[in-house]
């Protein structure tokens, strides 16, 4: 009997002692970088969802090593951030201690699964030797004007005691904890991601990423072309700009809308409307951007009492405020054309505002018309279609100095301040004379000071503000200053960790340029689709900044991205609160790591969400036990006697072996592991039925299965008499000629009725086939006493004998 407990421990110990998976550096070999999205080391440890993506990259890494590549396959920890801090607050423990314990537990669990990580390259984002370089990147951004301070409307979560980025809000609540979010103005550090909007958009085209992820990034960046138009406020010297993608509809404007928080609102509101305007502003101040811009919500708004003048026809139109207009998006003001825009139509219908048609088409009694058509009621645009009218209107606006062609983005700059303790300190000092300076590079890392009270202060300061010895500084001239007390978001360290794996112990620079040139971009990156517009966008942004600084040699970090699906339990996402988490340790204990790895790869396509079956690992264990019994004599743990595994080849397994090597290699490359495993099962069935198995095929099959079930295959490999690990044994190849059957079955008919069949060499000539057919005993029975008049032979198919 195969004992997974002893065999798995034995090989895990062997790999660790022999540094089996140390990253290769042979200059003659090609390089391959297989990366997992590193985990946040929570106290809960791994559940069976984690190993799915990890097993996939591990299989590819193991195959690539055997194919003669230098393989970089590292692992590390995304250790800063809210979850650890929340846990530490609840239990009173030190977040650093909690993090170290969680990492040790995670690492133990990962090693039990037999992953081929190079642990010499392990990184932890909360390690000062690591975040020294996170701070260094921030400093370079500051010097380039890409990191700046601003008073901005933010998403404030009192329950978390911090600001959260737009990307961290789901359905109007914080992604972490599901707490309500309120809008307020605060001084924040911002990263100028908008400066890279066009490149972030354009360079997506060159990436081998799932189309839905690319589409999510495109929508998040939200590039739109149109015009910026200046409206004057009636009876005043004030003006405001609107951005519109439909400048061709300017003649149809019947009102304008300002963001309620716009400074202009207070300046233009009439005394009669002031009370209503102030009440409305108070009512909406706690709403998040997402709530405010929800297309399905009821439209609300208030008239300011003021009017704007339409620059194209001099008509006066009322100025309203409404929460669907955001101060942070576009210009914070919109022109409304209810006849040709759904949102404007709903608003105008509710508040009884005019609906002026300027394009032919549709039924305005029922709904707005957004399609193409001939322009009407539009003076110099009459008779033109949409695109021609847009161009013509932009020319007119530019000629009259009341507008210009403009590109707008939905993407905002990245809110980079968090009012929490457990994060990278921002290396900035605010001086009493009002100036700001960076902590000198040679003094980095600016270490996070130890603190016992890490409760959020509930103010725009983080708990670091209480550590006065750390906060207060004096320069050599006696000038007093205070350190920045906000910390970086937990997305900071994960925006560049894949670079540090390439050169993890370098204390002179982030990573050596020549090494980066060898390994970048990442060849395969596997992780969850939930990171589409956060981590994956942030990392691309940082990478482009570093490219411009000459730190990295490529424009993009990750060439191929793949999202694994979720593993569900009872059709629901696994979570502690639902009590449906399956712990991999228990599965490994009962069935072995190889069975778990194989089951997770065999469940279905890697990118599908699939329900966990408690009997699944038992069925893959059954298959692996069959493999064991085919090759190993359980009594003495020696290879099966010579009569089954032989040095000669009778050709019986040629075709199925060639098919198996071909399909498994191609399917591993394409990440189609379930179909690769099915093909290995086909080979197993054939091998069990065969009288003998050529040694070359037995060993080749074990090598193909090794990336999926490495422990058992290492053991069988050593039983076959090999002293070295299977990890670097040359990957099997196949003879394409053997994909075609070397023999064919020939049907024999006598007077049109099937009377026999025989096997013959493929493409045998007619004479040979005729002789063979006539010699069959069963056929001769039907020819007794008859004369053979004619023999019709169709090579490779049939011999038809006509006899009378």
UniProtKB/Swiss-Prot annotation:
<dbReference type="Pfam" id="PF09334">
    <property type="entry name" value="tRNA-synt_1g"/>
</dbReference>
<feature type="short sequence motif" description="'KMSKS' region">
    <location>
        <begin position="573"/>
        <end position="577"/>
    </location>
</feature>
<keyword id="KW-0030">Aminoacyl-tRNA synthetase</keyword>
<dbReference type="InterPro" id="IPR015413">
    <property type="entry name" value="Methionyl/Leucyl_tRNA_Synth"/>
</dbReference>
<feature type="short sequence motif" description="'HIGH' region">
    <location>
        <begin position="39"/>
        <end position="50"/>
    </location>
</feature>
<dbReference type="Pfam" id="PF00133">
    <property type="entry name" value="tRNA-synt_1"/>
</dbReference>
<feature type="binding site">
    <location>
        <position position="576"/>
    </location>
    <ligand>
        <name>ATP</name>
    </ligand>
</feature>
<dbReference type="Pfam" id="PF08264">
    <property type="entry name" value="Anticodon_1"/>
</dbReference>
<dbReference type="InterPro" id="IPR014729">
    <property type="entry name" value="Rossmann-like_a/b/a_fold"/>
</dbReference>
<dbReference type="GO" id="GO:0005829">
    <property type="term" value="C:cytosol"/>
</dbReference>
<dbReference type="GO" id="GO:0004823">
    <property type="term" value="F:leucine-tRNA ligase activity"/>
</dbReference>
<dbReference type="GO" id="GO:0005524">
    <property type="term" value="F:ATP binding"/>
</dbReference>
<keyword id="KW-0547">Nucleotide-binding</keyword>
<keyword id="KW-0648">Protein biosynthesis</keyword>
<keyword id="KW-0963">Cytoplasm</keyword>
<keyword id="KW-0067">ATP-binding</keyword>
<dbReference type="InterPro" id="IPR002302">
    <property type="entry name" value="Leu-tRNA-ligase"/>
</dbReference>
<dbReference type="GO" id="GO:0006429">
    <property type="term" value="P:leucyl-tRNA aminoacylation"/>
</dbReference>
<dbReference type="InterPro" id="IPR002300">
    <property type="entry name" value="aa-tRNA-synth_Ia"/>
</dbReference>
<keyword id="KW-0436">Ligase</keyword>
<dbReference type="Pfam" id="PF13603">
    <property type="entry name" value="tRNA-synt_1_2"/>
</dbReference>
<protein>
    <recommendedName>
        <fullName>Leucine--tRNA ligase</fullName>
        <ecNumber>6.1.1.4</ecNumber>
    </recommendedName>
</protein>
<dbReference type="InterPro" id="IPR025709">
    <property type="entry name" value="Leu_tRNA-synth_edit"/>
</dbReference>
<dbReference type="InterPro" id="IPR001412">
    <property type="entry name" value="aa-tRNA-synth_I_CS"/>
</dbReference>
<dbReference type="InterPro" id="IPR013155">
    <property type="entry name" value="M/V/L/I-tRNA-synth_anticd-bd"/>
</dbReference>
<dbReference type="GO" id="GO:0002161">
    <property type="term" value="F:aminoacyl-tRNA deacylase activity"/>
</dbReference>
<comment type="similarity">
    <text>Belongs to the class-I aminoacyl-tRNA synthetase family.</text>
</comment>
<dbReference type="InterPro" id="IPR009080">
    <property type="entry name" value="tRNAsynth_Ia_anticodon-bd"/>
</dbReference>
<dbReference type="InterPro" id="IPR009008">
    <property type="entry name" value="Val/Leu/Ile-tRNA-synth_edit"/>
</dbReference>
């Amino acid at each position: 009997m195969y004992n997974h407990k002893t065999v798995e421990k034995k090989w895990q110990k062997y790999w660790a002692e022999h540094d089996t998976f140390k990253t290769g550096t042979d200059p003659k070999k090609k390089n391959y970088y297989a990366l997992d999205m590193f985990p946040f080391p929570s106290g809960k440890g791994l559940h069976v969802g984690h190993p799915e993506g990890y097993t996939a990259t591990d299989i590819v890494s193991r195959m690539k090593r055997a194919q003669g590549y230098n393989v970089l396959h590292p692992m590390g920890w995304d250790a800063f951030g809210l979850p650890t801090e929340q846990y530490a607050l609840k239990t009173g423990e030190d977040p650093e201690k909690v993090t170290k314990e969680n990492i040790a537990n995670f690492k133990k669990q990962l090693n039990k699964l037999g992953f081929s990580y190079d642990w010499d390259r392990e990184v932890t984002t909360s390690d000062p030797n690591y975040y020294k370089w996170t701070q260094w990147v921030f400093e370079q951004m500051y010097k380039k004007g890409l990191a700046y301070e601003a008073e901005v409307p933010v998403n404030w979560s009192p329950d978390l005691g911090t600001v959260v980025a737009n990307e961290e809000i789901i359905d109007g609540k914080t992604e972490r904890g599901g707490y309500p979010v309120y809008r307020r103005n605060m001084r924040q550090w911002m990263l100028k991601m908008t400066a890279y909007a066009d490149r972030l958009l354009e360079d997506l085209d060159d990436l081998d990423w799932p189309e839905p992820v690319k589409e999510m990034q495109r929508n998040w960046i939200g590039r739109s072309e149109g015009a910026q138009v200046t409206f004057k406020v009636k009876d005043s010297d004030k003006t405001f700009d609107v951005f519109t993608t439909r400048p061709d509809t300017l003649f149809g404007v019947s009102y304008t809308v300002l963001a309620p928080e716009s400074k202009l609102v207070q300046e233009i509101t009439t005394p009669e409307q002031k009370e209503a305007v102030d009440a409305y502003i108070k009512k909406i101040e706690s709403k998040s951007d997402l709530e405010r811009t929800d297309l399905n919500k009821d439209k609300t708004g208030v008239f300011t009492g003021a009017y704007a003048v339409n620059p194209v026809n001099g008509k006066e139109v009322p100025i309203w405020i409404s929460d669907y207009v955001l101060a942070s998006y576009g210009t914070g003001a919109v022109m409304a054309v209810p006849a040709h825009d759904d949102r404007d139509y709903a608003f105008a219908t509710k508040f009884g505002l005019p609906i002026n048609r300027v394009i032919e088409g549709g039924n305005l009694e029922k709904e707005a018309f957004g399609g193409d058509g001939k322009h009407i009621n539009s003076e110099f645009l009459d008779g033109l279609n949409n695109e021609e009218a847009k161009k013509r209107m932009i020319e007119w606006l530019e000629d009259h100095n009341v507008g210009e062609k403009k590109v707008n983005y939905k993407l905002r700059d990245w809110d980079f301040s968090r009012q929490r303790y457990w994060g990278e300190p921002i290396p900035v000092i605010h001086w009493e004379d009002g100036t700001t300076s960076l902590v000198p590079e040679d003094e980095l890392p600016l270490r996070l000071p130890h603190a016992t009270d890490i409760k959020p202060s509930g103010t725009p300061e983080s708990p670091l503000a209480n550590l006065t010895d750390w906060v207060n500084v004096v320069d050599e001239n006696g000038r007093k200053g205070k350190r920045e007390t906000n910390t970086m978001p937990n997305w900071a360290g994960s925006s560049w960790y894949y670079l540090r794996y390439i050169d993890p112990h370098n204390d002179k620079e982030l990573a050596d340029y020549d090494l980066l040139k060898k390994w970048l971009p990442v060849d395969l990156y596997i992780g969850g689709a939930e990171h589409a517009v956060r981590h994956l966008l942030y990392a691309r942004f940082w990478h482009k900044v570093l490219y411009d600084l000459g730190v990295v040699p490529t424009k993009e970090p990750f060439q191929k991205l793949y999202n694994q699906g979720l593993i569900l339990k009872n059709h629901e996402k696994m979570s502690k609160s639902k009590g449906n988490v399956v712990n991999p340790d228990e599965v490994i204990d009962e069935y072995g790591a190889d069975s778990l790895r194989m089951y997770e790869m065999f469940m279905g396509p890697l990118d599908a969400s699939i329900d966990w079956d408690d009997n699944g690992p038992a069925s893959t264990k059954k298959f692996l036990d069959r493999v064991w019994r085919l090759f190993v004599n359980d009594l003495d743990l020696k290879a099966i006697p010579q009569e089954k595994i032989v040095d000669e080849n009778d050709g019986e397994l040629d075709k199925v072996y060639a098919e198996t090597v071909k399909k498994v290699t191609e399917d591993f490359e394409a990440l189609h592991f379930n179909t690769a495993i099915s093909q290995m099962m086909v080979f197993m069935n054939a091998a069990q039925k065969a009288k003998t198995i050529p040694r070359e095929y037995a060993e080749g099959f074990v090598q193909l299965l090794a990336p999926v079930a490495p422990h058992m295959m290492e053991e069988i490999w050593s039983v076959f008499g090999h002293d070295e690990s299977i990890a670097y044994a040359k990957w099997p190849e196949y003879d394409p000629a053997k994909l075609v059957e070397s023999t064919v079955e020939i049907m024999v008919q006598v007077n049109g009725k099937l009377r026999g069949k025989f096997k013959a060499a493929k493409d045998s000539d007619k004479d040979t086939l005729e002789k063979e057919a006539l010699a069959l005993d069963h056929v001769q029975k039907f020819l007794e006493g008859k004369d053979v008049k004619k023999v019709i032979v169709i090579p490779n198919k049939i011999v038809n004998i006509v006899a009378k």
